[in-house]
Amino acid sequence: MLQISKLISQGAGLAPVLVKRASTLEIDWDVRQKSRFDALDSLGRQLGVFLPRGTLVRGGDVLIAEDGSMVRVIAAPQPVLRITACASHGSAFDLTRAAYHLGNRHVPIELKPDHLKIEPDHVLADMLRAMHLTVQEVSEAFEPEGGAYSAGGHGHTHAPAATPVPAAVPPAAHVHGPDCNHGHDHAHAPQAIKPVAIQIHPRKPHSH
């Protein structure tokens, strides 16, 4: 088994001619959302993919094998629901409402300017049709949004954020009021004694 532990997002920085010559790996979203899986490439090689946890593999990404060879990922067609606005009974804004309701249900969604795509679900399909949307069952590649905090399959790393250093705050003075009846569990530092200047006048002779 040929092991793979590196991914270059969309083949960034690689010569297009080399990417074109690379073997291919056609897999659907169910596999590509996993960071570890086994698969066969177009050359019949058994691949063991071990990527950092949370990595999403996208169509167009390039995997680098341990022997230095490249494998270009193709998003395989799969059954999906294609959702479009109904020109007769609705408006394009209905897609925005649909994306909102699907997002509240944490449904993976592929967003396009004129349509949405989700994995097959007859309950959601009925809900969307009730919202005056057109729902079609098709076989297409599925590339849902990865989320704002997803690793997203980036082929680079980000430097760690600097740790903020808290400003030193002097401790508040400890004042005992007349109603303060708690016991001392600490010592007070001795207060410095300020010198007091005493003026001495010469004594005048006493005359009778």
UniProtKB/Swiss-Prot annotation:
One of its GO terms (molecular function) is unfolded protein binding. GO terms for biological process: protein folding; protein-containing complex assembly; urea metabolic process. Keywords: Chaperone, Cytoplasm, Nickel, Nickel insertion. InterPro entries: UreE, UreE_C_dom, UreE_N, UreE_N_sf. Pfam families: UreE_C, UreE_N. Residues 145-165 are annotated as: Disordered. GO terms for cellular component: cytoplasm. Gene3D superfamilies: Urease metallochaperone UreE, N-terminal domain (2.60.260.20), UreE, C-terminal domain (3.30.70.790). Its main location: cytoplasm. Transmembrane segments: none annotated. It comes from the Bacteria. It is found in: Cytoplasm. The keyword Chaperone applies. Involved in urease metallocenter assembly. Binds nickel. Probably functions as a nickel donor during metallocenter assembly. Belongs to the UreE family. This is Urease accessory protein UreE. It comes from Polaromonas naphthalenivorans (strain CJ2).
